[in-house]
Amino acid sequence: LGDVYKRQNPQRNEVGMAEEKTFLIKIITPERVFYEGTAIMAEFNTSEGEIGVYAGHIPLTVILKPGVLTLTEESGKKKAALHTGFAEILPDQISILAEAAEWPGEIDIKRAEAAQKRAEERLQAHSSDTDMARAETALLRAVARIEALR
C-alpha cells in the first residue's frame, strides 16, 4: 500500500507529509518577471488575512492585498512590497500575478512617506468626493513600501 501511495503522491511520504521542503515561486507584474526561484516559505497578505505557505500546501487561489511579501529561501529571507493581484497556490509552486512588486532597493522612502500622509489626510477628511476604498488601498500600498524597508 505504501508503494501505491508513493506512486500516486510522489511529493509525499507515507504519513502525507511533504518530503520536499522547497517549492517554486514565480511573481509576475505587468512590467517584468519580478521573481522566479525556490523558497522554503512565502508569507503575504490576502483579502482573508495573512498567509504563510510551505511546500505541500493545499491548492488555493487567493486575492492579494497590499502588504509585505517575505520569502524564506535556503540562503535567508527576502522582503518586498507586494500590491494587489492574485495568487495560485499548488503543493509544489506558487504563481503570483501582481499589479506591482518592489524590492527594498527600488523604494523611495520619502515618496512612500508622503503617499502615506496624503492617504491618511484623505481618509480623515471624509469628503464626499473622496473614494474611500481607493484611499485605503493607497494607504496600504504606502505602508507596505515602508514596512518592506524595515
Feature locations, PLM:
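Intrinsically disordered, low-complexity segments enriched in polar/charged small residues
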Residues: 16-17, 62, 70, 127, ...
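Acidic/glycine-rich phosphate/pyrophosphate-binding loops and surrounding catalytic core
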Residues: 101-150
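Residue-identity detector for glutamine
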Residues: 8-11, 93, 116, 124
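Extreme N-terminal tail/first-helix region
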Residues: 7, 12-31
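Compact, glycine-rich, soluble single-domain proteins
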Residues: 24-118
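Short, small-residue-biased leader/transition segments that mark boundaries at the very start
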Residues: 1-5
